[in-house]
UniProtKB/Swiss-Prot annotation:
GO cellular component: cell outer membrane; transporter complex
NCBIfam families according to UniProt: PRK03761.1
Organism: Shewanella denitrificans (strain OS217 / ATCC BAA-1090 / DSM 15013)
Gene3D superfamilies: Lipopolysaccharide (LPS) transport protein A like domain
Bridged cysteine pairs (disulfide): none
Family: Belongs to the LptD family.
Protein's name according to its UniProt entry: LPS-assembly protein LptD
Pfam family, one: LptD
Protein location: Cell outer membrane
Keywords attached to this entry: Cell outer membrane, Membrane, Signal
Signal peptide (from-to): 1-18
Function: Together with LptE, is involved in the assembly of lipopolysaccharide (LPS) at the surface of the outer membrane.
Length: 766
């Protein structure tokens, strides 16, 4: 029979690792390796009212005397809290505070399971030694063997003549053998001495010393290298090194050796500031670019910071600069994509209260490849105040802005602009619709200065413009049966009348104004231009209609919107009077569609059609097939005629089609590819193909790309050095899970590779 021997004194050593966080869930596609479990571990669960610090000993036979030796024989089980030992035989010397166990021995706690031939534990020092062991780290997929395992008084592990792997039993994809392994339970990382790495049971690498993480905690060390080759940079090898400086700081340093250009180094520092602020600092440097005439030095530095100081204050800052216009086009930066041609430098501090807020902002935007430089905002002050229901459900809003515009060119005029907008809003809301009346007064004062007295903008200008906006919307709905499916159909007509007074603004310079898009939702805006340099006069009515289909679970399956603005009077204010179009009686007809065609097929599209001239101003359509989260097939087409090319100041027509896919070929093999073709130029714009294989303990990705390059004229390289128009190359990523890398590599980031990264184009509310 079983004999339960309850010791009220905690004589058992604490053979357990410190854990700051619960064991994380194992990521998708990892293989769970189950350690052995003794049936006697479940016996303690049958006992009730036992203090977790008490030791429970269960065995078939026992011979014990108080304060002397106790011998246990037959299916022995020691338990204390989450710590368990199972063995055939055990001896507890209470006087010497020693425990020994032999025969089918299993030790288990919440972090590790160990099998061994023998165990010798010294309870006074909380240490133990196990011989001929096999171990499994819970939740980490790490397991291995050791001729001897020592558990120190600091709860660390010392493994002699040991090995470990993350592959399942019988899989010899990789194995690390070492003379000594030390695992720090507090820091959750391991040190390894005199190690050999075996791949497919073949020794391929000797490592005198290395460190590896044994959990998801950050750990200093080398990450796996990346290999690539391209016509732009030649053979490229990146070997990132991660430095865990402190809990709130870390640094990644990446030497990137390129055969065509030289050594390119990238440094990234991440930090936390307080409880709600974070930031990042980047510095990239290429000394003497061998591929360019004159071998110039090329560099990038970036700083970004954002967060909340307290409940009221917010801060944001972002600054980036590069050595030349083609930096992102030539080099694989960690900060921006190769298609980015703007560098935003912004600093902003904001303060929020319930009825008001204020902010101070500075901004400088650098446009790569552009000779025309935008104005700098130095600074801008915003103050907004709002009061709900001041009288008869009428809301009062007051928005104000003071902006000082500077320019790098001393010959350009500068200005200070004060813009004040008091408004009264009367919103009427009901279950079947809404109607909003809005009255604004747009008051703007410009203080303009220039070195040229003949400049028409060298004067102060005051502008006062009234604005009236009436917007109404009605919601109709009814049950509908389509192809045997029950839906709820809505019809949502909306009408807007907009009146904006006219004032001559030809004596005001252009500082931050641009034309806004005329998409469906843009038709119902109360402004035609961004910024406040130009306020377009308007006397117009906009009509629109939206229809939706919602299923029994209230998920949106279909949405179609169409609308147009009718001009009662022609607008006299244009961005460029020399480009005035023939007077039109209406805007473009804008339509948008998002729908689930059938089960896993989705379509999304938009069109802007000039009804007076019968021309298509802009159109795009996307067809998606998404049978599951890891399966995607997307077809797309877009058409934009007469688009301004800012590099040449000429006009181009864009007619482009594309295909993108992500598909698992097997449980372990993924394929990602995309292809975009310019129908107008009859050439491929981009081709990308990637194959990724992932097993339980290693992963590899091989990809090929071919893309058009955007080469800018550059003062650093005036001749453009005979730059190639297209770039092609091959990339290789390899990860051994458990040796400085973690899996999976990720298919989603492959979708973001290339010029046209994947976006889900549908806006269905489901």
């Amino acid at each position: 029979m079983n004999i339960r021997y309850l010791l009220l004194l905690s004589l058992m050593p604490h053979l357990v690792w410190a854990a700051e966080e619960p064991t994380p869930e194992i990521p998708f596609s990892q293989c769970l390796i189950e350690p052995p479990v003794s049936r006697s571990f479940d016996d303690r669960a049958q006992l009730t009212d036992i203090d977790p610090n008490d030791i429970v000993i269960i065995s078939d036979r026992t011979d014990a005397s108080f304060n002397k030796q106790a011998h246990f024989d037959g299916d022995v089980s020691f338990s204390q809290g989450q710590r368990h030992i199972a063995a055939d035989k055990a001896t507890l010397d209470q006087r010497q505070q020693q425990l020994s166990a032999t025969g089918n021995l299993i030790f288990k706690d919440e972090n590790i399971t160990v099998t061994a031939d023998t165990l010798e534990a010294q309870m006074s020092s909380n240490s133990a030694t196990l011989d001929n062991t096999q171990y499994w780290l819970h939740g980490q997929q790490v397991h291995g063997k050791a001729s001897k395992m020592q558990i120190t008084s600091e709860n660390n592990l010392l493994l002699s003549n040991a090995n470990f792997t993350t592959c399942p039993p019988g899989d010899e994809s990789w194995l690390l053998e070492a003379e000594l392994i030390k695992i720090d339970s507090k820091e959750e990382w391991g040190e390894i001495w005199n190690a050999k790495l075996r791949i497919a049971d073949v020794p391929v690498l000797y490592i005198p010393y290395m460190t590896v993480p044994v959990s998801d905690k950050r750990k200093t060390g080398f990450l796996f290298p990346n290999f690539s080759t391209s016509t732009t940079n030649g053979v490229q090898v990146s070997t990132p090194y991660y430095w865990n400086i402190a809990p709130e700081y870390d640094l990644t340093f990446t030497p990137d050796m390129m055969s065509s250009r030289g050594l390119f180094t990238k440094t990234q520092v991440n930090y936390l500031a307080g409880e709600a602020q974070q930031g990042q600092v980047n510095f990239e440097y290429l000394d003497n670019d061998n591929k360019l005439a004159g071998s110039p030095n090329r560099y990038l530095y970036n700083m970004s910071h954002q967060g909340a100081i307290n409940d009221n204050w917010r801060v944001q800052a972002n600054f980036t600069d590069v050595s030349d216009n083609n930096y992102f086009n030539d080099l694989n930066s960690d900060v921006n994509r190769s298609t980015d041609n703007q560098l935003s430098r912004i600093g902003e501090t904001s303060y929020f209260e319930r009825n008001w807020d204020m902010s101070v902002r500075v901004q400088d935007i650098k446009v790569l490849g552009e000779s025309e430089k935008p104005y700098q905002v130095m600074p801008q002050l915003n103050f907004n105040y709002r009061v709900a229901d001041i009288w008869q459900a009428i809301d009062f809003n007051f928005n104000s802005e003071l902006t000082n515009f500077e320019h790098q060119d001393d010959n350009r005029n500068t200005a200070t602009r004060i813009h004040l907008v008091p408004s009264l809003v009367w919103p009427i809301q009901g279950p079947a619709g809404s109607f909003t009346s809005e009255l604004k007064l747009l008051q703007t004062q410009f203080f303009q200065q220039t070195q040229d007295s003949n400049n028409p903008y060298n004067q102060d200008v005051s502008r006062t413009i009234p604005q009236l906006r009436l917007h109404g919307k009605v919601n109709f709905e009814r049950p509908a049966n389509i192809w045997g499916e029950a839906y709820r159909q809505t019809i949502e007509p909306q009408v807007q009348y907009l009146y904006v007074g006219y004032e001559d603004q030809s004596n005001i310079g252009f500082y931050d104004t641009a034309q806004l898009q005329d998409d469906y939702f843009g038709l119902f805006r109360d402004r035609r231009f961004s910024g406040h340099d130009r306020i377009a006069d308007a006397n117009q009515a906009t009509v629109g209609l939206t229809s939706r289909l919602l299923d029994a679970s209230n998920r949106e399956q279909f949405k179609f919107s169409i609308g147009q603005t009718l001009y009662i009077e022609d607008s006299k204010v244009l961005l460029n009077q020399g480009l005035r179009d023939a007077q039109q009686s209406a805007s473009v007809l804008a339509a948008e569609l998002d729908a689930r065609l059938y089960q896993d097929w989705f379509i999304s599209g938009a069109v802007q059609h000039d009804t007076e001239h019968g021309k298509n101003k802009k159109s795009e359509v996307t067809l998606d097939y998404r049978p599951s989260n890891d399966k995607l097939l997307q077809f797309s087409y877009r058409f934009v005629p007469d688009l301004l090319n800012t590099n040449t100041n000429g006009r181009v027509n864009i007619s482009q089609m594309g295909v993108r896919t992500s598909w698992p070929l097997t449980d372990s093999l993924y394929f990602v590819g995309n292809w975009y073709h310019d129908l107008k130029e009859e050439r491929d714009v981009e081709t990308y193909t990637g194959i990724q294989y992932e097993s339980c303990c290693w992963a590899v990705r091989l990809s090929y790309h071919y893309r058009i390059k955007t080469n800018y004229d550059d003062e650093l390289m005036a001749s453009i050095d005979n730059r190639e128009e297209f770039e092609k190359g091959v990339y290789l990523n390899f990860v051994i899970k458990g040796l400085g890398g973690s899996g999976p590599l990720g298919v989603s980031d492959m979708l973001d590779e290339g010029l046209f990264n994947y976006r889900k184009p549908l806006y269905l509310r489901n």
